[in-house]
């Protein structure tokens, strides 16, 4: 018989929605939650997200658990029988698994409340524009603000049954990067009468990499990736505009500041050298996921005692996750959950092993009961 929460994952997988558009997802979650024993539950909506408080039997504190609920604008290529029914959208980062795990844990505690309050945060817009910071600033969250908070993220590179975690920095600081170049278009036969923005933008892509190699301490780490370039409209017209979209990832906020300062300095030079306008457009910023050392060591000890084959020491990764905003103010941690997939996160063929769902539910129930 198919595990109930694997079945839920498959249903959620078919209705992927991007940030702040998770209307069907929110409705699905609310419908499921409405069928749980309600004696200890309080539910609030926040935009397209949900907060659920499970009142404890003798509460002295509130423990938070956060899951993200949004999907990515990716066309799915898995050919699964439960593939996305929303063309151009896919749960390619595992948030469908994250939600089903959270529902599994919530279901248990709705029937068997813990001593302390438990707050379940179903957060929208993790992939962009970033939902963690605004939900934290909401009055809904403030009323139930937890004393500690936890979360997980699936990891294709780890096996099912493995949990990877480390104290301190787990995920990097991440900034989205959107740059526009505006010059003067013209006929391809007369380049001397135009300012070619394809040339300007292309040269900028190469030059910005010197920030990493020449302005960042070699013992530190940072990466600038340009994932999309667009310039011009037709083959025989010199492009008047060009656009670069990408990300910056660093291991500290200070290094992020260095990268941004140098990018803006380079842009001023580009305006002079290429007789153009260079403009930076706002995107999402993701604060580093910095695991609380005491909380993390407590969880590692729990794993070693209860799941001795599961614990794997993690390494810091350049991945971005807005859960870092929670951890910047509230003690807690995030861990990697092994799902053993051939394809990486954000890949159109990502197909996590679903056995990780009941395993994660079991681990989280026992851990939260131990708190």
From Swiss-Prot:
Amino-acid biosynthesis found in the keyword field: yes
Matches recorded under InterPro entries: AcetylDAP_deacetylase (IPR023905), Amidohydrolase (IPR017439), Bact_exopeptidase_dim_dom (IPR036264), Peptidase_M20 (IPR002933), Peptidase_M20_dimer (IPR011650)
Active-site residues, Swiss-Prot/TrEMBL: 68, 127
Organism: Listeria monocytogenes serovar 1/2a (strain ATCC BAA-679 / EGD-e)
Pathway as given in its UniProt record: Amino-acid biosynthesis; L-lysine biosynthesis via DAP pathway; LL-2,6-diaminopimelate from (S)-tetrahydrodipicolinate (acetylase route): step 3/3
Superkingdom per UniProt: Bacteria
General function of this protein: Catalyzes the conversion of N-acetyl-diaminopimelate to diaminopimelate and acetate.
Name of the featured protein: N-acetyldiaminopimelate deacetylase
PANTHER family xrefs: N-ACETYLDIAMINOPIMELATE DEACETYLASE, PEPTIDASE M20 FAMILY MEMBER
Record's keyword terms, sorted: Amino-acid biosynthesis, Diaminopimelate biosynthesis, Hydrolase, Lysine biosynthesis
Molecular functions (GO terms): N-acetyldiaminopimelate deacetylase activity
Catalytic reaction list: N-acetyl-(2S,6S)-2,6-diaminopimelate + H2O = (2S,6S)-2,6-diaminopimelate + acetate
One biological process term in Gene Ontology: lysine biosynthetic process via diaminopimelate
Family named by the database record: Belongs to the peptidase M20A family. N-acetyldiaminopimelate deacetylase subfamily.
Keyword Amino-acid biosynthesis found: yes
EC numbers for this chain: 3.5.1.47
């Amino acid at each position: 018989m198919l595990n109930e929460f694997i079945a839920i994952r498959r249903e959620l997988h078919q209705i992927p929605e991007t940030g702040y558009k998770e209307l069907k997802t929110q409705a699905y979650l609310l419908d499921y939650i409405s069928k749980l024993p309600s004696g200890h539950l309080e539910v609030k909506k926040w935009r397209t997200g949900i907060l659920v408080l499970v009142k404890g039997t003798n509460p002295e504190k509130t423990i938070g658990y956060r899951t993200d609920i949004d999907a990515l604008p990716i066309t799915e290529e898995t050919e699964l029988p439960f593939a996305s029914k929303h063309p151009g959208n896919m749960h390619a980062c595992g948030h469908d698994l994250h939600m089903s795990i959270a529902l599994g844990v919530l279901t248990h505690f709705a029937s068997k409340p813990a001593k302390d309050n438990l707050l379940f945060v179903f957060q929208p817009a993790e992939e962009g524009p970033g939902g963690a910071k605004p939900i934290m600033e909401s009055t809904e969250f403030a009323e139930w603000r937890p004393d500690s908070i936890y979360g997980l993220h699936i990891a294709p590179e780890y096996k099912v049954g493995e949990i990877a975690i480390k104290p301190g920095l787990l995920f990097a600081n991440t900034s989205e990067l959107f740059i526009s170049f505006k010059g003067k278009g013209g006929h391809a036969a007369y380049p001397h009468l135009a300012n070619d923005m394809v040339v300007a933008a292309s040269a900028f892509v190469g030059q910005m990499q010197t920030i990493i190699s020449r302005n960042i301490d070699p013992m530190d780490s940072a990466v600038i990736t340009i994932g999309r370039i667009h310039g011009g409209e037709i083959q025989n017209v010199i492009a008047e505009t060009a656009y670069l979209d990408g990300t910056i990832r660093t291991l500290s906020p200070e290094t992020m500041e260095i990268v941004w300062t140098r990018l803006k300095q380079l842009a001023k030079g580009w305006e002079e050298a290429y007789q153009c306008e260079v403009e930076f457009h706002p995107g999402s910023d993701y604060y580093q996921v910095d695991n609380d050392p005491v909380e993390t060591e407590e969880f590692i000890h729990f794993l070693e005692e209860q799941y001795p084959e599961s614990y794997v020491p993690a390494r810091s990764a350049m991945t971005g996750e807005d859960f870092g905003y929670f951890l910047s103010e509230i003690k807690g941690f995030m861990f990697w959950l092994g799902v053993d997939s051939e394809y990486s996160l954000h890949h159109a063929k990502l197909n996590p092993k679903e056995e990780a769902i009941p395993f994660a539910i079991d681990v989280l129930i026992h851990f939260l009961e131990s708190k």
